[in-house]
Amino acid sequence: MTTMFKPCPTPALRLASLVLGVAVACQLGGCATDPKNVDDGKSIAKLYEEARDEASAGANDRAIKLYERIEGRAAGTLLSQQAQLEQAFLLYKQQEKARALAVVERFLKLHPTSPAGDYAYYLQGLINFNDDLGFFGNLAKQDLSERDQQASRDAYQSFKQLVDRYPDSKYAPDAKVRMKYIVNALASYEVHVARYYYMRGAYLAAANRAQQALQDFRGVPAAEEALFLMAASYDKLGMAALRDDAQRVLKTNYPRSPWIGRGYEDKASWWRLW
């Protein structure tokens, strides 16, 4: 499955125009600064500038630490929110999934009405969304029963929250594309599992898994093979009525399906259902 997605934008651009003003206000008014702070009294604005410079230079670890300090010292301000999102974004770039998710979840809990809420949900979805693997990266090399799809489901829920809460967000169109991709990939995974069972002679399990895929994911490309698997499995089980019913649905909905009249290749034998 090949799908092109937009690259992740820099954090919460809608906050950017407000952040510098907040930083200046903190500098003039004094945002919760401890005189014994390891930053030696550096202004919030200066710290933020340094953090951005470090991030631009690729020194993500140093930038993350600075954003952590800003988050604490500017607590309750838009600058603190921006620092959280910048921090989460850099952790995401460094593939530190657990830490990145923790920061985003903290942001959403502390700032449920933030103007950058849509970006937070979008980033949360991206963290769980593994585009490179695409659910099929090393599928043939791995026992299907060992693969966990929870991260994919979590990503879907984050994107759904974004689309439902912020339908006009600039991130919504890409989130919708990713949601569709996830649904198709999850359905294909379920069919892969059904095929896995079938090829190992677990025909009842194969039929049940294929049927579940059809119930959970309607109108997906993998539905064709799911119907074929049901018919093939019922044929192996000697359940002619159920086999014929699955065959009828397949032919009715996909009259030109390549699965009609074919079977799976097996080292021991070839077989054809129709």
Residue ranges: model-predicted function:
Residues T10-A12:
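Intrinsically disordered, low-complexity terminal tails
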Residues A16-Q27:
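Bacterial N-terminal signal peptides
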